[in-house]
Amino acid sequence: MITRLRALLAAWTSAVPVAAVVLLALTWGRDLPGAVVALVILVLAGAVLAAVHHAEVVAHRVGEPFGSLILAVAVTIIEVALIVTLMADGGDKSSTLARDTVFAAVMITCNGIVGLCLLVASLRHGTAVFNPEGTGAALATVATLATLSLVLPTFTTSRPGPEFSTVQLIFAALSSLILYGLFVATQTVRHRDYFLPVTRQGEVITADGHADAPPARTALISLGLLTLALAGVVGLAKAVSPVIESGVAAAGLHHAVVGVVIALLVLLPESIAALRSARRDRVQISLNLALGSAMASIGLTIPAIALASVWLSGPLVLGLGATHMVLLALTVVVASLTVVPGRATPLQGGVHLVLFAAYLELAVNP
């Protein structure tokens, strides 16, 4: 019975990513009728679950924190490609697309995913435990990247409006790449233990011990299917975005809600993977996924946009407004206080979720 279930799981998690990419190719750039939209949403949900499965297979093979890093970088690279493609298409709102998408990713990961994982882990296990050294380093990097890329443009004077000059944009891009590269080296080479799960006594857990690691061939196949699944998730989310826009407009909501919904869809694989780790009392893996995604979103998007600006026309607005800067500052302060003790109660999770709810509420009613 167990063998049959495993065979069935392997079959559908292999078929769905391929189906998602095929469906994406058939629907890209077309007006979709209601029945096709329903099919797209169904395949999108399947692709999310398949991505989580294959990410866990790869993570089991390479170990932590490499597994979390692979998923975060894979999602972000595809997301960056989508942003550049949409900006190349032009439009009135393309000038703020990179800023809105990156900030949405930061708020979703640092408040939504972190808050939910801390809440789930602390309710199931009493307290959520993690390594404050590694988590603090990740948070400091996210805060620095966000400030340099999203806050400073609001106050620079070389260009009118919240924009960087060419030299400033190059500096921000290089700084983002350097900081992200330093973090990856720290996470995977010099101080890998800082990013591994810990016991309640503070001892590092180097292996889960549930089962033997999958063969290299299986891991490579899962890596390829993971890439297909993530491409399908991001692309199908874009394919249904006109339907989302129509629904948001019909509900009388602000247009920024569209970006939030799409960002939520794109980050679903990481969100589910992080929650599953939190349920298993591996909160450090959850935080690696959340903060790693926020970091990759800024650290890879800004350099890509800087490079794309060579051929993209029109302004590139990166600076946040006052309301979003307040939310970002409060997020950094609260997250710092959460990280310092190395353990969290449901209160800390609730605080982050309230901040995320405030972000959503202000997106609906700016």
Regions found by a protein language model. Give the residues of each.
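Hydrophobic alpha-helical segments, chiefly the membrane-spanning helices
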Residues: 1-366
